[in-house]
């Protein structure tokens, strides 16, 4: 079985892979995440996911059986990518823009080995209830929005803003598990390898 590496510093992605019983090693693979001019959000997340996987593979030059996973998530409102907020004003502007509206969350996952690469893109729709200014300020003060795409974490304190979701909850968090499991299977990596309570 190939050795799986996760080219991501995201604790959410580590937790999600662990949740489905996959054994992996975290790998640091830095790439330039600047969007290209006129690049669509779907093309952007796919390029970054694939770029992370391939950058990770190049770090593991000596390991022939390596398989590297990369992923990237973008919050998209009116066709515009909302990245990680630069500061408090940026975060509050994002939350104000998302307030009372539906937006898209796109996550791409890529797997690469020495012979091939495959990607999947999953788009989900999230609707926020209206967010009051004092709520947005209190949420920023919690520290949670600072390193999150779109300035919020659906699995965290921002759960109280979510009126509805169509699509993949795990995809919104950062790794669509149904599609990820399918990709892993294509590369000969099973889920449920290491389950809690397994005595073997």
From Swiss-Prot:
It holds the Pfam family Maf. The keyword Acetylation does not apply. The active site is at 72 (proton acceptor). One of its GO terms (biological process) is nucleotide metabolic process. CDD domains: Maf (cd00555). InterPro entries: ITPase-like_fam (IPR029001), Maf-like (IPR003697). One of its GO terms (cellular component) is cytoplasm. It is an enzyme of class 3 (hydrolase). Nucleoside triphosphate pyrophosphatase that hydrolyzes dTTP and UTP. May have a dual role in cell division arrest and in preventing the incorporation of modified nucleotides into cellular nucleic acids. This is dTTP/UTP pyrophosphatase.
């Amino acid at each position: 079985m190939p050795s799986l590496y996760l080219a991501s510093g995201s604790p959410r992605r580590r937790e999600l892979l662990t949740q489905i019983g996959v054994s992996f090693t975290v790998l640091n693979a830095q790439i330039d995440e600047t969007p290209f001019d006129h690049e669509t959000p779907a093309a952007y997340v796919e390029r970054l996911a694939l770029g992370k996987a391939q950058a990770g593979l190049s770090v593991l030059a000596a390991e022939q059986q390596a398989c590297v996973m990369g992923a990237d998530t973008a919050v998209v409102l009116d066709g515009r990518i909302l990245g990680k907020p630069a500061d408090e004003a940026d975060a509050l502007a994002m939350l104000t823009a998302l307030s009372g509206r539906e937006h898209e969350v796109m996550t791409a996952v890529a797997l690469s080995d020495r012979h091939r690469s495959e990607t999947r893109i999953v788009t989900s729709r999230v609707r926020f209830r209206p967010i009051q200014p004092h709520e947005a300020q209190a949420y920023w003060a919690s520290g949670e929005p600072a390193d999150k795409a779109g300035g919020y974490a659906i699995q965290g304190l921002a759960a109280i803003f979510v009126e509805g979701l169509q699509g993949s909850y795990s995809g919104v968090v950062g790794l669509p598990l149904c599609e990820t499991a399918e990709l892993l299977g294509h590369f000969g990596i099973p889920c449920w390898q290491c389950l809690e309570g397994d005595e073997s």
